[in-house]
Amino acid sequence: KMCIRDSFYLMEISNKLDANLRHFHQLLRVNENFDVVYRVIQIGGRDACVYFVDGFAKDDTLLRILQGFTSLKPDAVPQTAHEFSKLFIPYGEVDLLTDDAEIAVQVLSGVPCLFVDGYSKCFAIDCRTYPARGVAEPDKDKVLRGSRDGFVETLVFNTALIRRRIRDPQMTIEVMQAGSKSHTDIALCYMEGRVDQDLLSTIKKRIERLHVDALTMNQESLAECIYPHKWFNPFPKFRFSERPDTAAASILEGNLVILVDNSPAAMILPSSIFDIVEEADDYYFPPLTGTYLRVSRMVISFLTLFLTPVWLLFMQNPDWIPSWLEFIRLSDEIHVALIFQLLILEFAIDGLRLAAVNTPSMLTTPLSVIAGIVLGEYSVKSGWFNSETMLYMAFVTVANYSQASYELGYALKFMRVFLLIITAFFNLWGFVLGTVLCFLALVFNKTIAGKSYIYPLIPFSFSELKKRLIRTRLPHADGQGEEDR
């Protein structure tokens, strides 16, 4: 509202329609904005005007409400705006507003606002609708079994998907706004009695203190504003998910879920590294299968960090290779130093990934052929790369997609590149030092709630670690287990 207040002198809402029209025509810049529409109508012998944004209002609902005014007689119009709203606007969401800035924001948000001569209040009739796509399964967070719906860019649809799964009055959804220009809606979803109240109050205060024009990049902009962590710490402090079932499960566990309008992803906090590597498939399969998937994902993520640095260390010290690992030796002559091969491939893979994102779908297959055959096979034949280097980097590239977090994938990539460089320069001592620094980066890292990022490893808790590694059975009713046995 600050930007609107700074732009115009705002007066009190008048009970004279002409004064309100002059004021809001200037405030909303009706003559310049073709999509801001106003209609002057008659209600019981009184002049009235409704403002709305073309494309946001439900035409049939708004038309039905306005048609109900045509048959009103002058003696049937009540003296107060409250009585008028109660008698003649049969719609669930109607607010009586007197603040000019709030009315302007409501109109630009898609809420039709009605002014009636003789009333010093505005009727904000929430019959808006936003252009939205279907709640299809997200491309990133796919599952082998489970629900196939996903969040969209419309906030009310996303909150409805969560509310559908948690039908409990303790489930709370608070709405706040951020951005002096955009007035972006932010929903805080949590279970009363389970959420960390200190964390909740901290997040609310930080959102209220935001002084930005707009949340241009939605969640990422909000994350940077409410938690400005150090630039050299690559590990994500928030878990992002486009799945309503994942968000609902996190809320029931006592976490705070933040939804931002115009974004199809939910922010889950606080999140440790064990929370980030979890996926919905762990719970859509029986405990044994879920445990296998979870442990496999953790082991593969571990290998993406250490596979190429350990291989580089062995290639620099071939005498250390045991007999049962002879197959990892290079079979061809080295024309380019291994460290340069690995670093070039690290950047080349990111280049191919960016190219794939920006390539039209009809050209995806030709691009794959060029990347796989020309850049792969012929780069080995020409002597640029050794086949073993291509093999290990291919494994790292594919394994990086074993977990769904882009942020964690890039954090592991930065650590891997750091390990490669320090190992190439300082050999064994460099590898040991780099490993220790990576471990310390995790140890001294904290979640947004101030707890250990790698709990229950540090501080160690065997029972909690067991829950993180092993997918246990869901609790059953008393006596049901004995009957089943």
Say what each PLM segment does.
Residues 167, 208, 353, 380, ...:
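Short polybasic/polar patches that bind polyanions
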Residues 1, 5-310, 314, 320, ...:
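Membrane-embedded alpha-helical signal segments
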Residues 387-389, 393-485:
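Hydrophobic alpha-helical transmembrane segments of membrane transport and translocation systems
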